[in-house]
Amino acid sequence: MIKKYLLAFLLCLSAKAILAQTTYLQCGEIIDTENGKILKEKTIVVKADTIAEILNGYQEGQGEVINLQKYTVMPGFIDMHVHIEGETSPTQYLEEFTLNEADIAYKAQEIAERTLMSGFTTVRDLGGSGVNVSLRNAINNGLVTGPRIYTAEKALGTTGGHADPTNGMKKELMGD
């Protein structure tokens, strides 16, 4: 008898978790890239991290409702060439000598979140130190916010080429 009540209780908890993961985006306009049309007054129903359906009008249900009635919603962008661990800056070469892996990880997390908030839902990372892989895993596990990352892990290149970490360094500093 206790097992039946426990099972019913667990089913109720899981149903509540599923309902909590449903989001209703009330959109003024949606850009339909597949058909080349602009759809007006639609509701996008998102369950977990998947678009479940698009409904006519502004609908509500059991879950979070986000009012975007004054906005145009479009599919996420894909950036096919990023290095999520860093950005071009006046201090980028100095940072190769001063930042450790933990510093790079914090910086990469901030870059990933900013990338997602800029509309890029997917990126192709073309190489890093390994932080890129850990960041991808953390995003996939819901630990941090960021885009879907497809990564090459380490950059590939020839000696002296773009991916050679000793490129442009003083010969005495390079080692063997």
Ranges and model annotations:
Residues 1-22:
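Bacterial Sec-dependent N-terminal signal peptides
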Residues 20, 62, 143-147:
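Short coil/turn connectors at secondary-structure junctions
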Residues 25, 64-66, 150:
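Hydrophobic/aromatic beta-strand patches that form the interior of the parallel beta-sheet core
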Residues 25, 39-41, 60, 103, ...:
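Extracytoplasmic
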Residues 26, 40-42, 119, 145:
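Envelope-exposed proteins and targeting segments
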Residues 30, 35-74:
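Histidine-rich, glycine-flanked metal-binding segment
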Residues 72-141, 159-163, 171:
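Metal-associated gating/positioning segment near the N- to mid-region
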Residues 143-176:
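Metal-coordinating catalytic core of metallo-dependent amide/deamination hydrolases
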